[in-house]
């Protein structure tokens, strides 16, 4: 038989820019804990990516957040 495949959980957070590094640290820690709890993954297996977007690059209901 072959080797067992390891699936690494990846959480991608897309949000408007403006959060502090400390807020992002807390978010990443909490997300990692939740993923470990519900998937059985170890801490080293959980990846979290944060993608910050400016208000001129995000819209809701046809209106840029920049214009709100």
Set out the residue ranges of the language-model regions.
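A domain-level signal for the structural core that forms small-molecule/cofactor-binding pockets
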Residues: 2-68
């Amino acid at each position: 038989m072959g080797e067992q495949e390891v699936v690494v959980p990846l959480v991608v957070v897309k949000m408007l820019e403006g959060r502090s590094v400390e807020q992002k640290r807390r978010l990443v820690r909490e997300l990692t804990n939740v993923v470990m709890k519900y998937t059985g993954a170890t801490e080293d297996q959980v990846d979290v990516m944060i993608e910050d977007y400016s208000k001129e690059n995000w819209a809701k209901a046809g209106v840029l957040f920049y214009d709100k």
